[in-house]
Structures are given as structure tokens and as C-alpha cells.
């Protein structure tokens, strides 16, 4: 009897457990079926990826929808109840965009650094130029020990100011100096004197061939005068020396400045008072020509 009662109680308990399962709503059963179908679909998709890698791009995900209406996600994963979501790091253009941004930032930083270094170098060069200019303008100043820029050396190469060059142009160097008390004569007179064959070049105190008659007449002045000519005396102050281009000395008598004729012809056609009046050495110092060019300087003086 005890065994029969225990068997009846176990059957009643089993029946009570099966009763709630049979009383479940059809919605729960449909949801459970969808879950099982989804699991089966994922299993088949996984099998496709493992055994058929070339067909992995055809993977579609079955997502449960609203009111037991599932949908497929061709790209991405199930997101919410009606959409498909994809993470940014899963997109190829996401990484491309970041790569472009990083490269552009590096280029900008490199150009900024180069521009900064160039500006610093220009500023240093400008400061060095200013220091050199002030040192050259104000003369030698205190130079720090071990300085690579010697301002005292640069002051020697200071160019003149623009106003000084415009208003005071550079003058040629002075000509050969002469002894005091001897007036200057122009190079044109010496050139005319040599072109008329009134004098010739002699080195170291030789006599002039053109005035040989006057030189020979000098001894006769103490005795009798020559026939046909009045005694003419050439004063020592009316003869001068002229330096030639071959480092020689040419002795020339002073020509007549008014007519431009040699002194020999003037003596032959004029008297002694006329020669003294028209002699350029007897003229006042104001009427004497200006200083000749360098290298043709000459002076009236005694013959050495």
C-alpha cells in the first residue's frame, strides 16, 4: 500500500511540472524558435568561414526584429531592433583618414621648425651686421675677449659717406715736388718746344743742340759780338728741365708764350729788350699756367 501511494504522488508532481510548460504562450515558443534558428544560422556561417574562406564576404547576420520578424545584416552586426551597426575601426577609410591626418601634421610641424630656424638665423645675421656697422662707424671700441668679430679691424675698411663722395670727389695725387721759388710751366710748352727741334734730350746735364749758337755766343759776350746778330744772353732762370718717359732729363729754354715760336727764332728776329719783355719766365706768377699732369712736372731753374 505504501508503494502505491508514493508512486501516485510522483506522478502527480511530474504532471504538475509539465502543466506550466504546456500553458506557455505561443510568443515564447516562437522566440525560442527564432533563437534556435539564429544559433543555427551562425553555426552554418561559421562553418562557411572555416571551410570556405573565399565566400566569407557573403556572410549575413540574422537579427531578431520586432514582433518576431527577423532581418539580415549584410554588413556590420545587429544593433537595436531594426538596424545594423559597424564600429569605426572596422572601416578601411577610417584608417586612411587617420593616416592622412598624421602625415599632414608631421609636414606642418617640419615646415614650422624650418621657418623658425631661418628666422633665428636671419635675426642673428642682422645683429652681427648692426654690431659691425656701429663698430666701423664709431671706431674701435671695447671688444669682448675671445670674440670672433674684431670691430677694430672692420673700422679700417669703413667706406666714406655718400654725401662726402658726391660733394667732395676724390682728387688725383699731387705732382712731383719742386724747389721753392721756381714757377711751374705747362707740358704743352715742353711738347711744343721739343716738336720745333729747339731742344733735344740729354742726360745728366748735357747742353741743348737747338741753342748751340746761343751757347757758343756766351763766350763771345765777354769779347766781341758775332757778326749779323746782336749779343743775346739767355738768363739761367729761363731754362728748365723736363722729365721724359724713359727716365731721362730734357733741357728746354722757355718758349714765347704769346706767339708759340721757339726761343731761337725769337732771338733771331727780336732784340734783347723784346726778349726780356716776352719771356714767360719774366711774366708775373699769376699768368703762369696751372700744374701739369703727374709725370710731366717741370720747373724753371739752373741747368745742373
From Swiss-Prot:
GO molecular function, one term: WW domain binding
Composition bias type Polar residues, residue spans: 209-218
Keyword Manganese applies: no
Transmembrane feature ranges: none
Entry keyword Secreted: no
Record motif PPxY motif 1, residues: 159-162
InterPro entries: WBP1-like, WW_domain-binding
Effect of residue 162 to A: Abolishes interaction with NEDD4
Keywords, in A-Z order: Repeat
Motif residue range(s): PPxY motif 2: 172-176
Location of the region described as Disordered in the Swiss-Prot/TrEMBL record: 1-26, 206-235, 252-304
Assembly behavior: Binds to the WW domain of YAP1, WWP1 and WWP2. Interacts with WWOX. Interacts with NEDD4.
Domain remarks: The PPxY motif 2 mediates interaction with WWOX. Both PPxY motifs mediate interaction with NEDD4.
Name of the protein described by the UniProt record: WW domain-binding protein 1
Amino acid at each position: 500500500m505504501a508503494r502505491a501511494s508514493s508512486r501516485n504522488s510522483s506522478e502527480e508532481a511530474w504532471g504538475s511540472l509539465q502543466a506550466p510548460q504546456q500553458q506557455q504562450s505561443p510568443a515564447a515558443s516562437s522566440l525560442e524558435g527564432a533563437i534556435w534558428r539564429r544559433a543555427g544560422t551562425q553555426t552554418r556561417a561559421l562553418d562557411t568561414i572555416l571551410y570556405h574562406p573565399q565566400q566569407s564576404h557573403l556572410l549575413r547576420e540574422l537579427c531578431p526584429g520586432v514582433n518576431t520578424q527577423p532581418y539580415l545584416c549584410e554588413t556590420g552586426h545587429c544593433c537595436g531592433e531594426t538596424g545594423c551597426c559597424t564600429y569605426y575601426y572596422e572601416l578601411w577609410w577610417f584608417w586612411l583618414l587617420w593616416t592622412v591626418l598624421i602625415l599632414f601634421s608631421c609636414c606642418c610641424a617640419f615646415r614650422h621648425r624650418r621657418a623658425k630656424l631661418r628666422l633665428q638665423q636671419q635675426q642673428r645675421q642682422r645683429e652681427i651686421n648692426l654690431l659691425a656697422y656701429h663698430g666701423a662707424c664709431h671706431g674701435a671700441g671695447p671688444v669682448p675677449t675671445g670674440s670672433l668679430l674684431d670691430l677694430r679691424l672692420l673700422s679700417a675698411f669703413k667706406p666714406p659717406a655718400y654725401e662726402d663722395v658726391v660733394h667732395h670727389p676724390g682728387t688725383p695725387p699731387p705732382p712731383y715736388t719742386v724747389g721753392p721759388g721756381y714757377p711751374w710751366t705747362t707740358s704743352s710748352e715742353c711738347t711744343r718746344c721739343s716738336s720745333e727741334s729747339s731742344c733735344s734730350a740729354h742726360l745728366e746735364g748735357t747742353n741743348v743742340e737747338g741753342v748751340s749758337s746761343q751757347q757758343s755766343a756766351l763766350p763771345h759776350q765777354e769779347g766781341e759780338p758775332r757778326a749779323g746778330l746782336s749779343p743775346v744772353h739767355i738768363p739761367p732762370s729761363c731754362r728748365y728741365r723736363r722729365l721724359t718717359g724713359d727716365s731721362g732729363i730734357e733741357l728746354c729754354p722757355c718758349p714765347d708764350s704769346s706767339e708759340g715760336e721757339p726761343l731761337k727764332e725769337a732771338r733771331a728776329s727780336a732784340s734783347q729788350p723784346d726778349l726780356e719783355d716776352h719771356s714767360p719766365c719774366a711774366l708775373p706768377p699769376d699768368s703762369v699756367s696751372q700744374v701739369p699732369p703727374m709725370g710731366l712736372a717741370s720747373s724753371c731753374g739752373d741747368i745742373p
